[in-house]
């Protein structure tokens, strides 16, 4: 085995924390962790540290939280660490070329898609939304472009018909860390050569926003079913029922035709709603002030709210 490396890790959410755990358990020395500044969260809007920061502090690793890495002082601070390698996972800040050039072996990134497909901010959800048959993690050498660098390793997993954004996220968070460790070993001993991405196959995974989560019942049912899965656990698809917000956490395809948004049927199996093509059976819902419930429970207690002919989304 090659000598342990001096590694700087940069990441922010739970997906990144899983990678940091693996690195902390490896022979390599994590000399510092970079993560986003603490953000307000929860009802009290209290400043909360990122999952990566919390993990780093538990292991007594120095934590850096510069608002930008374009600042010469922040760049000098990073250079003073004399890293062999920088590992970046869902960090959320742009790394300018001067930063990419600091580590002796450069910077690598674990990206939650099979590049060049789904470059960008929300690759997991976009893969589910599009109905892709598979997803995975790509470990790449970073360059100035967004997720454009040479690919070092890929780990692949099927996307099932039951996968949500959440379940696929968790599976990729397990696939990524061993792939990163394998890539580090290959870079350290000089055996790993990157594969240039074919830009003609690239597409962009735009950041999620809550407006997209509003169900447009004029769309085909299969498209909406994938959207419901992709946007669980965030931002959660929703519609309105009698001017109240109705969150839709799970749904499957059903037979039926009618004006889009019209309730065609309600039973313990679910609430059947007409779409632009075919129908959707809503199986897990959340009403204002309530908790998420299977439709069976809502049907038993709130049956009157779901009268046939009622139109959602008005």
UniProtKB/Swiss-Prot annotation:
Keywords: Protein biosynthesis, Transferase. GO terms for molecular function: methionyl-tRNA formyltransferase activity. InterPro entries: Fmt (IPR005794), Formyl_trans_C (IPR005793), Formyl_trans_C_sf (IPR037022), Formyl_transf_N (IPR002376), Formyl_transf_N_sf (IPR036477), Formyl_transferase-like_C_sf (IPR011034), GART_AS (IPR001555), Met-tRNA-FMT_C (IPR044135). It holds the Pfam family Formyl_trans_N. Gene3D superfamilies: Formyl transferase, C-terminal domain, Formyl transferase, N-terminal domain. It catalyses: L-methionyl-tRNA(fMet) + (6R)-10-formyltetrahydrofolate = N-formyl-L-methionyl-tRNA(fMet) + (6S)-5,6,7,8-tetrahydrofolate + H(+). GO terms for cellular component: cytosol. SUPFAM superfamilies: FMT C-terminal domain-like, Formyltransferase. Its EC number is 2.1.2.9. Attaches a formyl group to the free amino group of methionyl-tRNA(fMet). The formyl group appears to play a dual role in the initiator identity of N-formylmethionyl-tRNA by promoting its recognition by IF2 and preventing the misappropriation of this tRNA by the elongation apparatus. This is Methionyl-tRNA formyltransferase. It comes from Pseudomonas syringae pv. syringae (strain B728a).
